Amino acid sequence: MLEQQFAAEIQHIIDNKTKPLGALGQLEQVALQLALIQSQGKEQAATHIELKQPQMLLFAGDHGVADEGVSIAPSAVTQQMVLNFLAGGAAINCFCALHSIDLTVVDCGILLPVDSDAPNLILRRLGSRTANFAFESAMTIEQVEQALRNGQQIAAEKIAQGADLLMFGEMGIANTSSAAALLSALSGHEVDHCVGRGTGINEEQLSHKIKVVAQGVGRCEGLSVNAILAEVGGFEIVTMAGAFIAAAEHKTPVLVDGFIVSVAAYIATLLKPEVRDYLLFAHRSEEQGHQIVLSLLEAKPLLDLGLRLGEGTGAALAYPLLKAAAQFYNNMASFESAGVTV
């Protein structure tokens, strides 16, 4: 858990800026959390918030449950989008370029491997895709454990290279089905409350998707977290959970994207509760399951734009708000320094 000995001092710094108490709203909470994180292990409170090297990690993986027609897109699209990311043509590339966010793609196990020596591609393949969880376990326990280790290693390496804020994105056809199954199985919420429209399926397809997800969830009762990850998890989701754990271990904040990334964050908090203190939440997505996981994590997202793209786009769009929080904390005058009396 975050050490709180400097919390009052940081709050005093915020309260004594030239503004009414609380006038910057949620930005003040962001500044408090960032300053508190950056004070961990230090001898004094952080008087300056550093956000100089943001890192976006985009985890890609394919899902055997796609065979059940739970998405309107075929699994081949995952590879095509990975190539698009590497070529700089996706929405996430546009937003990362706008805000000077470094983007790295991680192949956790997509159906069609990418033949590329791009420097921003990391290969951590656990297979060509998960098994179809409608009928069998999606992953083995060994794959779950390796995925967690992979995520921890990747995040730790980026932090060692200077990253001071992490953001995670994802790509994988049918990964909303895996995320919904994980959320239902781990939280006990009804399947039909966790399943959403994903890529834009119609009512008939949604009903079918709920039934498919329920088949996997039905095998999960009474299982451990790792066993549930094996039953209905995804390579990219579990790898991402490991990355969340490493971020907390290395005292680095993570700006959390939408539904799938939030489910990975929830998994990480079940495995390591201290992860929660390092999470800031970018946005509220259109996926109905996202409302559930945000509630479970007691999270108040910064944006509500009706996004349902994934890729880390919501996190990239919210990043300037973190910069704004740091800017006022670092540079806004205090009442005393400005000679303002109240």
Swiss-Prot record:
It comes from the Bacteria. Its EC number is 2.4.2.21. Pathway: Nucleoside biosynthesis; alpha-ribazole biosynthesis; alpha-ribazole from 5,6-dimethylbenzimidazole: step 1/2. It is an enzyme of class 2 (transferase). The keyword Cell inner membrane does not apply. Keywords: Cobalamin biosynthesis, Glycosyltransferase, Transferase. GO terms for biological process: cobalamin biosynthetic process. Catalyzes the synthesis of alpha-ribazole-5'-phosphate from nicotinate mononucleotide (NAMN) and 5,6-dimethylbenzimidazole (DMB). HAMAP family: CobT. Belongs to the CobT family. This is Nicotinate-nucleotide--dimethylbenzimidazole phosphoribosyltransferase. The gene is cobT.
